[in-house]
From Swiss-Prot:
It catalyses: nicotinate beta-D-ribonucleotide + ATP + H(+) = deamido-NAD(+) + diphosphate. It comes from Pseudomonas paraeruginosa (strain DSM 24068 / PA7) (Pseudomonas aeruginosa (strain PA7)). Its EC number is 2.7.7.18. Catalyzes the reversible adenylation of nicotinate mononucleotide (NaMN) to nicotinic acid adenine dinucleotide (NaAD). The keyword NAD applies. This is Probable nicotinate-nucleotide adenylyltransferase. The keyword Nucleotide-binding applies. Disulfide bonds: none annotated. Coiled coil: none annotated. It is an enzyme of class 2 (transferase). Pathway: Cofactor biosynthesis; NAD(+) biosynthesis; deamido-NAD(+) from nicotinate D-ribonucleotide: step 1/1.
Amino acid sequence: MGKRIGLFGGTFDPVHIGHMRSAVEMAEQFALDELRLLPNARPPHRDAPQVSAAQRLAMVERAVAGVERLTVDARELLRDKPSYTIDTLESVRAELAADDQLFMLIGWDAFCGLPTWHRWEALLEHCHIIVLQRPDADSEPPEALRDLLAARSVADPRALKGPGGQITFVWQTPLAVSATQIRALLGNGRSVRFLVPDAVLNYIEAHHLYRAPH
């Protein structure tokens, strides 16, 4: 049996307990050997985060330290060119054995935007896609994805076979925590204790991150 590896990308600006809880739940539900938190470089379609890539990475490293099965993959931050998901998947897949299963976790909103991604139709050549659906999400995928879903969608997440090529949906009620909310609290000099892991809080405070300029 090959290994089961998950990738969970995000800007993690900062990483918070909502990210961590989703990661732990998915690692358990899919019996993953490893779930890699993958801090995104400034994606070509996203604004630049206000904290440096090295600082975002340091926070994720502290968040996963000592947490079974959770690791960090920094490859997107180490590239010196625009960072596309397809490049990451090709790079990760090249390091795995042929029978290893690779799972990419993405949220519903990101999934609906998939047709705008660079070489998006090639993503499934390298991995399975697990879409995390929130109860409050719109339930209709865009037209551009309907043929793909008809051909590749699997109702039972446990039925994903082979190294990649299929899509499944998992209902998840995320914790009501957002990085935007955390940045706003910190900018107003408020506490974010219990919204981020303690080690992340310590790092934020030590480096005075997200504080409003005086």
